[in-house]
Each structure stands twice: as C-alpha cells, then as structure tokens.
C-alpha cells in the first residue's frame, strides 16, 4: 500500500470551487514557474517531515502523482531535481518556463495523455521528450489515440476538450503502478 498526502497549491488566500478552475487562481501560478516550483518542493518537504513525525511510510520511497494542474506540478518537481523515485503526470500541461537542466532529473518520469488533449498537443509532447532526452532522464510518454483531457475523471463529458476514457484510465494506472513498483525496487 501507499501513504498518500494531498497538496493545496493555492494556499489560504483563496481557491476555486466546483469542477472548473478559474484562471484567477491558476493564472498566477502558471505565470510564475519559480513560485510554483518552490511551492511543490516545499510541499514535498512538509509531507516528508509529517510522515516521519507520525512514523508512517518510508521517506526513501517517495513518488508524486498529479492530474491536470497537479500533473504539471509533478513534472516540475522532477525538473527541479527533487529526490523522488518517480513522478506520474496524468493529462497535465507539459510546457514549462524552466526546463530541466542536463543531469538534474532524478525521478523516473511518466506522462500519460490523450493524443487529442488540447492542453497537451503533440508539439508539447515532442518538446517534453526532447527536454527529458537532454536532461538524461528516464522517461516514458504514453499518448492514447482518440482520448481527450481529463480521461481519468468519470464525470468528464465535454468533448472535444475533455472526456472520460475507461481504457486509458485503466491502462494508464496499470503502467503507473508498474513504474512505482520498479522504481521503488530499484529496477529502473
């Protein structure tokens, strides 16, 4: 099993409600990648300290999963050189203003996307691939044909932007769990 912590990237000053994430909350974080990266790294350290204080989990076996904006954040966590075994991004934004430096990425990186996701078009997937190559990272990008954004959310039903996909959801999670098992066992 896993010990799971959730991160609030918005803070106490306000947060979105409902399924839509207003740009008034998301926009400033997207425009300030240094701030976003600092927050996600601070969250990792706070979670690690909390787990140690409570005596739960194994701090040497850390990974990060993220969905949509969270998927972007876990990619930035990897780009920053954070000491995590793996990061898994589900339908996250792949672009960054702070690409990984050569040799910086320690985590095994998995980005799972719909090939028809307007938030992560092919050009962005190609750019992430090139960035990971230059960084010398261990990476996998999986794009499901005919699949849109939010494919892991059974309530998503707004094609052509977002729509649930049972097969992409199932296969993506299977690959993510296999990556975690291998990363924690030192097989990759």
Spell out what each predicted region is.
Residues 1-57, 152-158:
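Serine-hydrolase catalytic machinery in alpha/beta-hydrolase-like enzymes
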Residues 53-67:
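Alpha/beta-hydrolase fold nucleophile elbow
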Residues 66-70, 74:
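Gly/Ala-rich beta-loop-alpha elbow adjacent to hydrolase catalytic centers
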Residues 83-93:
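A conserved short beta-strand
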Residues 105, 111-113, 117, 144:
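Short beta-strand/loop motif that positions the catalytic acidic residue
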Residues 116-120, 149:
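Acidic catalytic loop of the alpha/beta-hydrolase fold
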Residues 121-132:
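Short alpha-helix in the alpha/beta-hydrolase fold that links the catalytic acid
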Residues 133-188:
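C-terminal catalytic histidine-bearing segment of alpha/beta-hydrolase fold enzymes
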